[in-house]
Each structure stands twice: as structure tokens, then as C-alpha cells.
Amino acid sequence: MLLVLPVELVLIEGKSKNMERARRVLEMKGITKQYFGNTVLNNVSIDLYPGEIHALVGENGAGKSTLMNILFGMPVIHSTGGFSGEVLIDGEKVELMSPAEAMQAGIGMVHQEFMLLPGFTITENIKLNREPTTKNALSRLFRSKSLDYLDVPTMRKDARAALDRLDLAIDEWAPVAGLPVGYMQFIEIAREIDKKEVRILVFDEPTAVLTETEADRLLESLRRLAADGIAILFITHRLDEVMAVANRITVLRDGETVARLNRDEAVVERIAELMVGRKVEKVELPPRAKEPSDEDIALTIDNLVVDMPGEMVRGLSLSVRRGEILGIGGLAGHGKLGIANGIMGLYPASGRVSKNGENIPLNSPEEALSRGLAFVSEDRRGVGLLLNEPIDRNIGVTAMQVQHKFLKSWPHFLPALRLEDRAELRAYAEDMIRKLDIRCLGPNQPVRSLSGGNQQKVCIAKALALEPEILFVSEPTRGIDVGAKRLVLDLLVRLNRDHNVTIIMTSSELGELRKVCDRVAIVYRGRLAGILPPDASDAEFGLMMAGRVGKEAV
Amino acid sequence: MRKFVIGLLVVAFLVSAIGVVGTAAPAYKIGIVTGTVSQGEDEYRGAEKMKAKYGDMIKHVIYPDNFMQEQETTIAQITGLAADPDVKAIVVNQAVPGTVAAIRQVREIRPDIIFLLGVPHEDPELVSDTADLSFETDQERRGVTIVQLAKELGAEKFLHYSFPRHMAMPLLAKRADIMKEEAERLGIEFIFATAPDPMGEYGIPGAQQFILEDVPRQVEKYGKNIALFSTNCSMQEPLIISALNTGAIFPEQCCPSPTHGYPAALGLEITDEMKGNIPAILKAINDAIVEKGGAGRFATWPVPTNYLLVEACVEIARDTIEGKMELSDLDAVKARLEAAASVPMELRRLPEKPDGNFYLLTSGSVVFGRDEF
Amino acid sequence: MTDKLKQTVEHIGIPRLMIAGFLAVIFVTAYITGMSVPQLLSDSLVRVGMNGILVLAMVPTISCGVGLNFGLPLGVLCGLVGGLISMERGFVGFPGFFAAIAFAVPLAVVVGYLYSVLLESVKGQEMMVGTYVGFSSVAVMCIFWLMAPFRNPELIWAIGGKGLRSTLTLGNYYGKVLNNFAVFEIFGIKISGGLIGFFLLFCLLVYLFFRTKLGIAMLTAGANPVFAKSAGIDVRRMKSVGIIASTVLAAIGIIVYAQSYGFLQLYMAPLMMAFPAIAAILIGGASLQRATILNVIIGTVLFQTLLTTALPVTSRVIQGDISEVARLIISNGMILYALTRSTGGK
Amino acid sequence: MIQSPEQKKVESGRDVSLDMRHIVRTNGVPILFLALSITMAAVAGLSPAFLMNEVITRFARNSLLVLSLLIPVTAGMGLNFSIVIGAMSAQAAAIAVTLWGIKGVSGFLTACLLATPLAAITGCLAGLVLNRAKGREMITSMILGFFANGIYQLIFLFLVGSVIPFNSKSMLLPQGVGVRNTVDLINIAQSLDKIWRPVISGVRIPVVTVLVSLGMCVVITFLLRTKIGQDLRAVGQDMNIAEVMGIKVDKTRIIAMILSTVIAAWGQLVFLQNIGTLNTYNSHEQVGMFSIAALLVGGASTRRATIFQALIGVILFHTLFVVSPLAGQKLFGVPQIGEYFRVFVAYGIIAVALAIHAWQDRQMRKEAIREAVLTE
């Protein structure tokens, strides 16, 4: 996709020079934050001028959300020991202990998930809990503001004004339910700018759910708001958008500020490199007897469409070599997670998927499982585990249901009524606990009380019980500590090498993909952007994730 | 707009309802209000009998099974009868709560309708002031007669089962007090036991199960010569069964009638020729009791009270409307009652309201295995 | 070890400790006032046996994720019809009892299936809809009892000669067959091996069922529907099976109940049948998401013992009968407690 | 919901131009029951004057109770079965007024005054309980009603006369403890109805009582247009969003319960003054059941209910109640079958209405998903 820079951008750039001299509206200095001993932010600083659009970019887990949580005084920050460093607004040090205080200080936030009531009109949503009221006889009698009438004309006037500032011609009294997603985003923004005191607006990945035209309109509004003197902090993955609107760009990586660029110094390639770049400690992976090749294809995906909210797959085709570890990368929202979920029948899917030439019927987990596919879900606690059940039940249940494992052999004719073979299951679970080094009190322990890493191992054990030919693993290291991460990755490599399992591993952490995979496929907007070798340069990965190179890079 | 359309439909419906309706009539009608058979077969069948006898002259409607909660429906059923201009008299048996309210409402538009009640549940004095005529078994007298009968059957103790809701009914509470006095006078130990309320949330089964469990306990404690009595209809079957099994004495049901409790408790076979044939039913009960070894320990009235009350009320209503009698004429009332019962009856007025038409009735008893059938 | 101890305490829970304490007070009082404690215990055991299977009927619906089965009267009605057909056909004794079950179960399967189809279409409102479906089906069956073509002269009304009586005596048919089977005495406590054994047999059957492939699939579907889906389990079907199982158990439960009780109760009697069963399983420590056989046994024992002993004992001690009202408050208080406690359920 | 001229224009332009299919789809429940009522009225063959009289009396008697359900629905708490608590408060007040012998309208007003704080306190407690059972409000409020019934019995059967002083022998049981099962409310009987009750072509209209109900509609409309009303609606739509937006969700829900309970208490007093006698231990038991049935028949759902639906619901439900026993009797030829038929209809109504709504919700959600997929 080629990017056409709008003409007025030049003007904004011109302005930015002047702004250097203007007073900063926000400064966050030397912010350091630890969660349970893990440093997630290390001496991060960022500042904002009135009328500036400041882009904050970084991979998942780079620390953007934590920084914003600090700015908003979220309870989660204070309940976990606070942070060090200081926040200044208009040059004065502030201590924001709650979102309400942040709001009072003039900070507005456009939420990623819409905080809109579908049954209310646009006006009612914009003025939610800030409704202007007029007195009436009863409210005077009881001296209660609660009994004041809503001042509907003023509400509408205010809402109209806010919508006009965004150049939104929609009827302010239309109900929100049924509006296109893009409009909802604008209503969120309108609500923020309707707050008279708002001078700083934070946009947290606002375009993630928008179509291209909607995204363009949103960027347009951003510029408009900046022109009105509002300082904007713009968090996004989409580098082309950054290039289109940002005056300055701050790149976060692993909780540290790696770069701060002015618009004129920045090029997409450079930002991408800064975002993903990290010293990849290339470990020598054990060799195989026979290296996988295109001659021997295990799984063919053809024009796969998956309707997974937030991770739509829109016609993806891909071939997986037998015996390889294939990585699937890409930015959040581009559909990399939808692939495995679609093939495994968890979300509505269409297209053609075949294993060894045999067609796999879609939309049925049972069909996929019984054909030697297995899946370790990214949603460990939601999809992957029965939290209140013991380890052995978690490990065995899928294999039991799909392959009649761990069951007594009687009655032959009615497998549904065969009893569970406790001894066999227990023995298997104990074996797995030993092999995967699951730290627990025994196979009877409910998995809820296990640590994240051990829970993940239970998930993998569950998939292994199926003895799969092809294993899908999504976000295998999400939310587990560093030591456990390595163990999990090692485990996957061992499975691949020792048991010849073909692994398709989806991850938001490019680093780990590059560490263990034979090839890394990058997904962009629901389609395959290209496949790179793990040792391709940071810039190549960055560009491909930003959708800046065509297909067939390999 | 949408509201308008619905509103229009409602109006259209009410208008159409007016068009649909239209009734032709005989000279006058009598309304009868009873419960369903599951509440008590006697009064329902009494109404059926009257319906069979007088045909269209009788309008029979039902109050709800859970009449305690659905007063409004009872009221609507009664006022519904009164809405028919041909209805000149309404018989309510049993007169469950809500009847007084209904009568008051009807009086405002139809002061001409006479109300005849059987077994009123509400305050007797209140009922006496409202209804034109009421029948109730003479609870105070029965307080004496039942205990005397028990003594006659060999009782040394007298066990009285009830529960808060019934003891909140003044007549029943008073009767219990009288029973106690009479028992003490006769040298019988009076025992008051609490049972679960069958109208409570565990319902009739819970109450019945309690009786089945409690009677053996009591008999073990007090011996076989104990007379059992309960204020609640649904407890009669388990009481009779337990009395038969333990050898206790059962002098009378709450609502005295051969068909109340006995047929179900004894698993009586009702052949075609027995249907509605009281003497035949009495004989069959007698045979069953004797066979099970209960001779001389079980008794009841020879007539199904509620059954005959419906008949008596209808006849009294007819004769009153046709000017053949006065409701305040105790002898005339008694004559019609005895005609319906075909056994002698004793009748008196409620002592608290000597000038009202609240009549209290008593009948002699028949003892199974002793009397001739 | 401390974990185990903590778990045990958690398992017992405050409400159960309270009720157990209350029961202890009652038994001590009974002893002091000279009541026969073994007799009270015997009565309580009978109650446990007769109510147990109805309580057990709650387990499948809770396990498959539908929640408490407020539609229990549906199964009860099936059981009553089965019991009636057996009587109409003149079966006596154990054959009568088993014939009743044999007639009732297929009916319950059909009714349970239809009920599950209905509940599937009202997801999220299962308990409310269940309550009212139960209520209205009782009324429909009232009409059925009046019109049904039963001819057995022992079943019909005395004066009218048609329609079924509201209370049918089972004495000549299969009344007390279980209760009188294998009766023995320990320490003066009369125990009916037949009745208690039958209840425990069903506990065992249900326990084993939840150890089969199907049962585990159902548990999984109830515990985490998304997990179940990802494990290739048809969640809808599991709910169906759970509701059918519950309905069948209710049908068998009412037959056991009736034979012990000695009567079949028709008309409005089944209306409130669900409530004591629900109270019992909640008192036993079950939540809206999870119920075990142990919950059933503990709950039934505590609740039924409370019902059986509280009234006769307290009415000895205090004049009047506050115990009847106290029972109302305690049992509803327990359900309320459970509803306000269990978290996470949506 | 507040409507602006534009909104109406949009509606009339789009889908209300007598599009019968749309009307049937969105009002399936009331139309079903309207059809049922007409059929049954035709079968029952009641006199129109009687039917009108009966329906108007019942409308006057019950509409306030049904209206009391609206606010909790608006606040997203579903159908409030615990209005029986309000009814109990009202009965306590009615008993007190009878005891003190305050007659006529002043007696009625005294009872209202007395019932209000009682209902407010109990309603607040109910709100606290329901806040701990979010998502299960309906079944919880139902059990709460049963529970409160136990407390009520404890007070009036055992404490009155023993712990609570009570000096009227005629209202107490013979043994001096506990209130009798029927209390004659002669002092306040029909006090409101009697003020002005003209007869128009055979139909007696208790004008003042009807006006009270309509007045309550105005009050509710007023409330919903105030700041607190807006909060209630916001909480009703999505508790989490409301919380994030700084609305005190728990407090708002408690206010909803207090309002509902207080209105229910007044409603029960209107009901009792019309009936004229009080069934001490049972009058309140079915209040929640029947009011809810009426509201559902009017087309309300557990998530959305309007004043109009409440009023239409009262009329339809009670028409059905008046005609169904007779219709059943005529249809089956046996009076008691008619009665069971009526019970079936009463309970069945709620089951069917809940089922239809749940089904409609699912259909709507499915459509929303389909649309979302299409726009992609």
C-alpha cells in the first residue's frame, strides 16, 4: 500500500518548530514501574505540547498501556505499589490517584472498547453523567440535584457543537445502536472533547476496528483537534498513520524509550526497525535428519476466511511444510490469531484446509481434532483450561472425548457410557508432569492454583495427549514469567525435533518467533503479507508488518 | 403511532365484545360458587346435583384452588354471577376469604340478591352482618360432642392437630379451647399438636407426611386409646390410615361427611351403582373398617355436610325468592335442611348474633362396626 | 496438610455448621424432654430416602450449566402418570413399583427433551422460564386428572364416579414396598435397607455416570462451554442430556417418594415440589454452577432431618409453633444466601 | 425514552407507517393476548357492562402495583418479585390504621404516610441484597419475597400481642397473640373509590382511583426525565459503562428498589381499600406474580418496559382473567376445568412471554451479527 501524504502536513510540521517554544502541557519524567518485581517501564519520559500530535508506538508488551494507566491514575497502578518518576501538567507536579482526578486535570481518553450505551441517543451518550439540568419545583423542595430536569436543549446544543468540531453531520438524536463502528469511535471522541476542561486527549489504537475510509476520517479529525490546540497522544500499531499525522514519535520497546523522532527525521522503515529490533540471541537449534521442504507439505490453507471479532482473516492462503515450526506474526488485529481458531472450528470459517491432501471440514472442532490437529489456545484461562478441575482431567478430557482414550473398554457398543480409566489417566498425567516439568502438588491439584507457566504446560500436555501430527500454538508465552517462557519454547522445539510434530506457532513477540521458527509468516489485514526467514533483518520484518512490502518475499 | 394502533385494537375488541354477548333467560337463576374437587368433592358434587336437577336455572362457578392468595378471582367470580340480572340468589360453599368483600361489592349494585353461605372462613360476626344466611357446623357444640363421642368410643386422651393459620381463625381456635375444657371435665387428657401448614410452601404432601410420622410417635407415647382430630381437610386421609394402623380412635373429621377422607384412605372401590349413593358408600366404608379391625373406633356423620348444604341452600333460596319462607324462620330453614339430609339435624343461631341468620348445625354420628348400615 | 484442613473447613461451610449445630441442639432437647431420639432418627432417615432422588435430580442440570431445575414438576408429573398407569393396570408390590418406573421413564425422556428444546431457546432465562413452565404444566395436568380415562374404581371420586381423586392410596398397590424391604435395627434406629439402599444406588449410578465419557463431557460443557467446544463436545446436546436426566430422576424420585408416603398426590400438590429439593442441595453446599453427590447427601440429610425433628421437638418446648415459621425463614434464607454468595455466574 | 420531534419523524418515515409486520413483530405478546382475550370473551358470553365494570375496577385496583415494576426494569434489575415486601409494608400500615380507628380518606392517607418509610427501609434492604446477586435479580427477588413472608408471619403471628403491644381484642386471636386471619378494613374500605364514582351507561368508574394511577404515570415520567432517571437508564443498559462513567451503580440500584417498593406499598393500599378486607397472611403473596404477568402481557420484557405497556397489560391481563374461567367452563363444559384452565393461562402467560422475549432477543442478536458480517 502506498501512502499519500496530505499537503497540510507540511504546515503542521512548520508549526511544530514553533511549539518547541510553547509551554508543555504534559510531562512524564523518568517513569519506572515494577509489577511483582518485573520491571515493565524503565525511566520512560514523554512530553506533549498544545496542538501537537505525539505518536507512541511499540509492540505488544512494550509498556504503552502501563504508561497510560499511570497517566490516568488507574487503581491497578496504586494497588501494585505505585511508580517512581513524576507527572507534570502545565509545569506543575500532580499526583493522579484516580481516573476522576485525571479527568479533572484535563486528560481525556478515547477508549479502545467503546464505552457507549447502545440504547441511548448520541447526545445522551456524549453527555453521560455530565448532563446539564434545570431546577423544578420538586428538586427545589427536596434540594436534590438528582431530581432536576435534564436540560435536553442544552444537551443537544453541546452535543451538536462537539459533533461539528469533528465535522460529523449525523443527527445528534439518533440512537447509537445500529450505527457503524466508525461513528461510535467518533462519538467517543465527541464525548471527550465536549468536556470543556480537556486539553490532553489520549487515543488508544483508535483505528484498530475501523475501515480504511473511516480511519482516514479519524486522522482528519485528529488534525482538526490539534489545530484547536488540544494536545494529542496517539497510540497505534499502524506506522502509515503515524507518518500521516504525528508531529513527534516516541518508540517504546521492552519498557524503555528507544527513540524520539521528529516527523521530518522519521521514515517508516526506521520506526519499524526500532519497534521490533532487539538482539536476537540466536540459539543453535538441534538439527534434523531431514530438513522440511516444499516437497513435503503437511497442511494447505486455501483462501481461509474467519469471522473472529477483532482478528478477522480475509482470504489467507498458506502451505505448511511437514516437520517445520512455522511462525505466524503480525500486529494485533490483523488476523494472525484467527487462523488457528478458524481451522480448529472455534469461530465461523470458510475456505479450504487440507491435511496430506485430505480435506478438513471446517466449523467443527471434532473433525479437526480427530484428524490429528491440536490447538493450544491463546486464551489459556478462558478456552484452554477447566480452572476448577484437576490437572489430570484437564490433560485427558479432550483425548477422551475425541479419541476414546483413558476409558475402560466396556461396553464396546456404547462408548458414551464407558467409564473413565482413572489409573491410566493418572499415570499419563504423572508422566506428563514429569516430562514437562509441571510444578504441582500432584495430578489432583486444580489448575486454577498453578502459575501461568505451569498452566501453559498443562495446555500443551492436553494437546499432546491427542498425539497430534500438527500442533497449533497461539501466544505460548503470553502472561508467563521469563524463566517459564524459555522452558515453554524449549519444549516446543523438543516436540518438533523428537516427535516430529509440525508446529504452527502464532505470537505477538516477533523475537520468540525468530528464535525457534524455521520460517515466519507475516499476516497483514487478514491476508498473508509474506514469509521471511527468521534471520531476516529487523527492517524487513517491520516493513512487512506495516504492510509496506508485497507478497512473496521468500 | 404504534401505541395508537394497539389502543385502537383494544377499543375495537371491547366494542366487539359488546356485540358478541347476549343472553336469553328463564324466570330467575341461582348462582353456586364452589371449589374444585381437589379442594373437596362434596360441595362440588352438590352443585352438580343441583345443576342436574334444575338445569339452566343454576349457574355454577369455581373459586381458585389457592383461594388464600387469589381473593380477587373469588370476588370476580361472585360479582360475575351478580352481573347477570336474572340471578336472584348466590350460594357460596365453602365461603372462602373474599366472600365478604364480594358481597359488599355486589350489594352496591344489586341489593336484591340474597347470599347463602356454607362454611364461611371469615369472622362469623362479620359474615353474619354481611350475608343473608350462613350455615356452619356448630363448632362450639362439636367441641363438646366430638370429645363426648371420643369418650364413648373409649378414648383416654384426645389429640388435636392444627397450625398457626387455622388457629388464626377465631371459630377453630375457640373450638379447640372448648374441646380442652370438655376433655378435662370428662377426665381425658387433651394434647395440642402443631402440624405444618398445608398451604405453606411445602404444601399438602409435607403436612400429610408429618401426620403419618407423628401419629405412631404419639400413639407410642400415649397408648392406643387416643382420639385423633385435625382441623385441616387434607390431613384426614393420613389421619384415618394412621389411626387404622396404630389402633387409635377417630371420632370425626374436620368437615363431617362419609365421603371426606374415608374413601381415599381406605382405597374404596367406587362401582357404578355406588356413585353418589351415600348409604351404599357408608356400607362399603363400614365393611372396609371392620375388615381392617377398626370396628367401634371410627365414626362420622351419616351425611356429607357440604354436599347437603348446597342442596339445602338452593332449596331455601328458591322458596325465599318465591315467597314461600323467610330466611329468619329457623324452623323453615331446619325443615329444608333435614329434607336434604334425610336425617334429623340440630340447628341454632350464632350466640354472638342472636338476631342474625348465621345458623349452626349438628347431626348425630354413626359409628362404624357398631351401627347398622 | 494445612491446605487439606482449610479445604475441609471450606467444604463444610458456615451455613452447614450452623444447621448441624441447630440439629444438635434439637436432639439434645429431644433427649431431655424424653422424646425417643432413635425414633426421630428413624423418621429422618425415611425422609432422606424418600426425598433424596428428587434432590439428586438437581445434579445433572447444575452440572451441564443450566442451573437449578425449577421445572422439576415436569418430571414429577411424568412420575405420577407412570404411577397411575401402573395402578390402573393393577400391578401390585414390587412389580407395581417397577412398572410405575418403567411407564414413567420413557415419558420423562420425551418431556425432558421437549423441555430442553424450550430452554435452549430461552438461554439466560432458564430458571425463570422453568419455574413457570412447571407451574403451568401442573395446571394442565389438573385438567388431565379430571378428564383422564382411568377406570379403576379405586382411583375415582366417590360421589361423582369420574375423575381421579386428589389423594390416591397406594396401600393395596406398591405402597411402602421399598420401606418394608430389608428393614433392620441398629441402636433402636429402624433403618429401611430398601429405601436407603435405593437412594444410595441412585447416588452411585449418578456418580458413575459422571465418570463415563458422556458424563465427563457434560461436566466439561457445564464448567466451561468454550473449552468444551474446543474439545469437540456438542454443548447443546449435553444440556439436553442433562435436562433429560434431571427429568427422569424427578420422575423416579416422585415414585419413590409416593411409595414411602403411601399416597399419590395429584392436582396442585406437585406445584412447589422443586423448592424443597433446591433448598436441600443448596444447603448441601452446591452452587449454581457445581453440585456433587456429596452435596446431595449432606443437604438432604441436614434439611430433611431439620424438617422432621424441628417441629415435634420445638412444639414440646414452646407453646405455639414458631418452628413452622422458623423453618420458612431458614429454608428460604438458605436459598437466598446461596444466590447472593455464588459469584462469577452470569 | 425521551423523544424529540426528529426521532418521531425518523420512526414514522421508516418503519411505523402502518407496517403491520413490524407491529406484529415488535408487539407479538400483547397482540397474542388481545386475540386470546377476544376469542375467550366471545366464548364466555359475559355481559359487556359487567366486563367493562370488572375491567375498570381491576384497572383501578392493580395498575399502581404494575407501575411499581417499571423502575427496576429501567435500572436493568429485571422484574421485581420483591414488591411483595412493599405490599407487606402496606398491610402493616393498614392494620395500624384499623387499630387506631382513623376513618375514611384521612385513614387512607395516614396509612400511605405510615407505609412509605416502612417500604423505603425494606426496599433499601432488598436493594442491598440484590446488589449482591447481580445478573440473578429476578430469582433472587422471588426468594427474597418468600423469605420476607416468613419474617412477616413471625411478626404478625407471634410478636404482635406478645412483644409488640396491641390493644384491640377484636383483631387478635382468642389467645391474645397474633392477628386474626381476616381484618375488616371497614375504616378505609373504598375510601378512595367512593369520593366520586359516576355511573356511565351501567359502568361505574372510580374516578379518583383512576386519577391516582394516572398521576403515578406522570410522576414516573417526571422521574425518568430527571438526572436520577437518566442514571437509572444508564445503569440499566450497562452497569460497567455506567460505573466507568462515574455513576454510582449500587446506589442507583438501591434507589430503584426503594422507589419500586414504595410505589408497590401505595399500590397495595389502593388494592386493599378497594377490596375492603385484608387477608392478613395471604393478601400479599401473589401480588408480585400477577403484577408481573400483567406487565409481560402488555408487551414489556425483562429489559424494557414502558408506562403504556403497563397500562395496556393491566387491561389485557385482567380481561383475560375475567373471561378465561367462564370461557374454559364453556369450552370444556365442566366448571372446574375452566378454573384449571385459568390457572394454566395465568402461569403460562409468564412462561410464554418470557420465552417469546428471550427468543426475540436472540433473533435480534443474530441479526446484529449478520449485519456486522455483511458490513465487513
Short names for language-model regions:
Chain B
Residues 71-88, 105, 205-224:
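Short, well-structured alpha-helical segments in soluble
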